[in-house]
Amino acid sequence: MVAEVDSMPAASSVKKPFVLRSKMGKWCRHCFPCCRGSGKSNVGTSGDQDDSTMKTLRSKMGKWCCHCFPCCRGSGKSNVGAWGDYDDSAFVEPRYHVRREDLDKLHRAAWWGKVARKDLIVMLRDTDVNKQDKQKRTALHLASANGNSGVVKLLLDRRCQLNVLDNKKRTALTKAVQCQEDECALMLLEHGTDPNIPDEYGNTTLHYAIYNEDKLMAKALLLYGADIESKNKHGLTPLLLGVHEQKQQVVKFLIKKKANLNALDRYGRTALILAVCCGSASIVSLLLEQNIDVSSQDLSGQTAREYAVSSHHHVICQLLSDYKEKQMLKISSENSNPEQDLKLTSEEESQRFKGSENSQPEKMSQEPEINKDGDREVEEEMKKHESNNVGLLENLSNGVTAGNGDDGLIPQRKSRTPENQQFPDNESEEYHRICELVSDYKEKQMPKYSSENSNPEQDLKLTSEEESQRLKGSENGQPEKRSQEPEINKDGDRELENFMAIEEMKKHGSTHVGFPENLTNGATAGNGDDGLIPPRKSRTPESQQFPDTENEEYHSDEQNDTQKQFCEEQNTGILHDEILIHEEKQIEVVEKMNSELSLSCKKERDFLHENSMLREEIAMLRLELDTMKHQSQLRKKKYLEDIESVKKKNDNLLKALQLNELTMDDDTAVLVIDNGSGMCKAGFAGDDAPRAVFPSIVGCPRQQGMMGGMHQKESYVGKEAQSKRGILTLKYPMEHGIITNWDDMEKIWHHTFYNELRVAPEEHPILLTEAPLNPKANREKMTQIMFETFNTPAMYVAIQAMLSLYTSGRTTGIVMDSGDGVTHTVPIYDGNALPHATLRLDLAGRELTDYLMKILTERGYRFTTMAEREIVRDIKEKLCYVALDFEQEMAMVASSSSLEKSYELPDGQVITISNEWFRCPEALFQPCFLGMESCGIHETTFNSIMKSDVDIRKDLYTNTVLSGGTTMYPGMAHRMQKEIAALAPSMMKIRIIAPPKRKYSVWVGGSILASLSTFQQMWISKQEYDESGPSIVHRKCF
């Protein structure tokens, strides 16, 4: 197939010009200007061009594209031909080219199929059915390729060879599938033809079915064992062939049948690459739905996407891109593992704790801030002794915040829970308790400072302003809170630092001189930009001067103030001790929280480990469960096999019981029925002669009401019908030994069981006889009627000639059986009839009766009615004989009247018979008397012997057995001896055996066979019929 290029019109499907038609692809508009725009190629429509024309065109039009010449492949215009396109000549003109002069008679009949069935049977009798013509074609090849199912069925019945190959190594099944003759193909499959035989191109029957888009035939081939992965010489499986030929429906069918999507042709191309090269977006989409590998490369190292890009198949490129994106998303979703996420969370948690030890972020709290006015005195004390408390402040700061995370005192663990998840309430309550203690202390100090040094309204105003600024700062500069736990206010931390500094100053024995000044300076210095400690406004102007008398008062006041300061200092020390105690408790709480956090991390790691152990345990349990299921299935299969074997044993026991129940006494003895064309003979096995012998005729009233005073019946059988022949229409249900009217034949059997033998057929096994060349359909119909209509418990069908041979005590010989309707010559070797040497002659007693009526009519005697015909038959059986030398007998009768005989008719009239009594049987040896061109009975017997194997001819010559009522004429054995001796080799010994009771020899042979102890193993039981149907008669009755 040639790839479709989006920017160019589709290539034309017109046949290619020049001698390259069978080798090159389709022509496109790059090659001929006349193709452009129309999409069709007009070159080559008027005939092939010569080489000079091709060279001229080539020189004018420049480079040829890869659709036209293999030398242009790889130019980038089409990727299909990068490795060479496939030769589709195997699929071109599937039917045979037949010339009449090349075929013989049988092959012509098989090809045309316009031959009568009986003529075709005669052809098959004289011709080898497996004969091949010049092109190695058999009759089965020709009939299958041309759809002559009737001929095919007849050839299969003749057991012709099924897997014969013609000159292209194709079987008859291959030709039937290739020519889409489904009926013939199904018949061949049912008879066991191998569907996997490749032809010279490597194609099997499934390849041709896929090429023809015949899904029903492909399904049938797969049911009969066709290989779905067979490859032809191009490396194409049926799936690759369907993709290459853009057969979307059969490709979809093969995908459902689990065809290998990753199979490669001889160039390493997958089905996807072939679909891309062929430009079939629908097949590409169908293959992508099956998750096919899109990254596979052919032998040139190119992928399907590269072919699509180079061929400008934009739709296919988009399909491949979308498929790849879906695969990437699927892979990314599969790679996300919950256990791995939890592990990463634990690692991040540990790194966060490490970071909290090195850096302390600014704390935030939801608790109300401590009033800043209450801190001013402590802050002034801090400024006064600034040089002595730096280390202590650092230690205190580090001690308070030890173990803090990024967000405050109690860091929040990173997990899948919401960010506002809180720690347990006991930790939060402990923290709140510490903060309340600090608040109480500040409230105690705040009234003193606020009453002496500040204006309440001004302080409240300043506090509100500072609070609003702090909130703005927290909104703009503070990091996002990870916890809702309360944090210690910065002012509270600063107050603790101040008290620690005062205590340090006590230890070093600081002087009291300048304390107020230092305190004042510390307060002034502490007034920073953030306005935590605003300066107190003096009520006197700065430039105000005090007199000297007031100066002394000032010093006395200063001493009082100093004394107050010492008192306050002592109170501060007491408070400092309490704060240290609370601080230690706070550190303990933080350490406890850290230990609990590490414990929770450890628990998480333990949970992860336990989770992985549980997963492994679940996997082991699943594996154990699968093992148990598999073992259960094996045990179930074994139990079913045991049940099946026990069932078979029980069936065999039932069969044995049924056989044992059928004892050979008069009540359940085997019924033997010989169905002849003229007479029906019936009786019980083991008897010397049949108990019932009656004509095989059925009579129906000619008009309703003709038998009005009598008990009128719809039909009459046998002697009763013969006695009423004047008012009945008589019919013979058998013609030339073959049953033609099954309704009348069923009436004869019913009459045999209930009127002649007076037995119930459902209580007796039955042995029926048949003609040697009885059709298979007749055998099956006979079996069906016995089992379904008469419900017989068992039955067997035997060939009449074999039973005649058994009567003479032989198992090897040739039987010439001539009855009322047909004559057969059947060679038998070691108890087996030879069908290829069996011959049939439609000349017997009925034809002799008609001939005798004719010659008597020439003498002036008229016999026209059925009753008169019976009179003629009686004359034939009582007076006629076979002349040893016909010419001599004719001369004797002409010269003397002493050989004439008289016969009295029922009405008293006497007729005279001269040469008619030996002229009538002479027609058996000279059928030309009757206007027939066939051979006589002696030549037919000789021809059967000659068709047999050379090694057994001697046994046949010495064991020639006569059978049937027509062989009862006196002189028959001597005439046969004389005629066959004249035909056989001079040194060959001839022996004709003519049993005295040969009129009933067929029935007697059946009686002998049915009385054998081994006969029970030969017959067909009702159970076997129910299991296999009527076709079982072909397997058990040979």
From Swiss-Prot:
Comp. bias intervals (Polar residues): 448-457
Keyword Repeat among UniProt keywords: yes
Pfam families hit by this protein: Actin (PF00022), Ank_2 (PF12796), CCDC144C (PF14915)
Molecular function, one GO term: structural constituent of postsynaptic actin cytoskeleton
InterPro entries: Actin, Actin/actin-like_CS, Actin_CS, Ankyrin_rpt, Ankyrin_rpt-contain_sf, ATPase_NBD, CC144C-like_CC_dom
Mapped ANK repeat ranges: 135-164, 168-197, 201-230, 234-263, 267-296
Protein name per UniProt: POTE ankyrin domain family member J
